[in-house]
Amino acid sequence: MEKAPPGAILLLMLFAHSCAVALNATNDPGADEFHVGVILDLGSLVGKEARTSISMAVEDFYASHKNYRTRLVLHVRDSRGNNFQAASAALDLLNNYNVKAIIGPQKSSEAFFMTDIANITLDLLNNYNVKAIIGPQKSSEAFFMTDIANISEVPVISFTTTSPSLTSDNNPYFLRATINDSTQVNSIASLIKYYGWREVVPIYIDTDYGRSIIPDLLEALQGNDARVPYQSIIPQSATSEQITQELYKLMTMQTRVFIVHMTSPMASVLFTKAKEVGMMDKGYVWIVTFGVASLIGSLNPSVLEAMNGALGVGVYVPKSTELDNFTVRWNTRFRMDNPNDPLLKLSIFGLWGYDTIWAVAQAVEKAKSTKDTVQIQHMTNSMTSLKVPKETENGLKFLNAILQYKFRGLSGYFDLSGRQLQPSTFQIINIVGKGWRDVGFWTAQDGFSQRLTRPRSNGTYLSTKPDLNPVIWPGESTNIPRGWEIPTSGKKLQVGVCTSDGYPEYIYAEKDPLIVGMTKASGLAIEVFEETVKRLPYALPYEYVFYNTTENISSSYDDFVYQVYLKASKTL
């Protein structure tokens, strides 16, 4: 294959797809071509959506900038969603320790990945002399790609990798054209505090994506006086039966407020099973994080039905005529790209992909506005016998051009100067029927609001009064759940009761004649006690134990209290 000119650029968008077609954005023979590698997982919702969006972005950009002397050319590849962690370790061994053999890997998918994906990636880097990589979709893929970027010194740009554990601190060529998952934790914790819930159970997938948000989430919840008595960790390979067993376990606990942080496929199984076991009934609270909330419109209708009553935290996308027009065109294009698939709803990931291409194309033109002197070194990779180009000048120049470019795109204010997008506004949604409705908005500056007014110059929005719209909770209830219930098992607090000789209106107790072992109690003291228990921020199961002080003249109230003391002493 003939190599592209030294000024070429590869934007490797790691999402996964099996296509090796170059999408040329121009017919101008005089334009400098910058080759962009696109690796997508088109078996996923986001991957399919992204391919359509980025293709349209290239076409739209150069239709609006016909005088530009640079052009991006996309080269689509397929990673098939394989595990990039094994490949990252293999490349580290091959490059840093010059090993001649690798034992394993353990999984066949890892082996296929090492031979397929590594070759695809390094082939693109070698043959097209790339200067940037866009992607990947998964955090595990991103770790692998940042290793490649560190070898070749090219930027990695991902608009879907939200894991907080992947930062630019140790990966200077990594840019996150999406949010960091940790940016949503304060909005979630504020939501818990707003409704007065005191205990929360996170349910998350046992991967880097699932685990990495937890420390920041726990800190935010603690700062809002909410306890986390238990964490439900779902293995990535969990079966439906295992998920059902975990749900039954949660039902035995008093907490009824759950925060779900996992991939949309696993969340679909979780909520389907939760519906089956009765955990989507009245009294339960479910909150899904950004990863699931952003894809609500593309989930199966049966899953949406199971999720009815849940809340979601997403990133607000400002409405605009440009967005409306693009959505219409995108729907038509998506049907053409995927004639055998049901129509997906365009999500913020597709918009970020579109805006990322515009940012890259603009940066390419800016970086090439002056004549470059390109110095390229090569590092041989033992596994593939391919050479990885190492940029020492233009990679940094291109990176700086991206960092300096700010604009208002389809997704809103697009600014990577901090090496990742900073969401200005989070949107709280309530899943109802076959869709969702707005509950309100949250900003770090103003907290909650029902509506947003005019935007500020920095992309943030002015909010209205600090309140939220009504919610239809699980079980079609409009009453705010208290967040806890008496557990189905466990010890109960035994409350001794007796009858007052002269004042039965103060306290009266007797054994229930219909139920063996049951004690009936009434009176002012009982009413005060039961009302106090109701106001506790947690469940306190209890039962009355009758103590007769009237039948035995030698017994007295003092004896009754002393018996309580003796029982406590024996317990100690």
Placement of each model-derived feature along the sequence:
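Extracytosolic ligand-binding ectodomains
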Residues: 1-520, 524-547, 554, 558-567
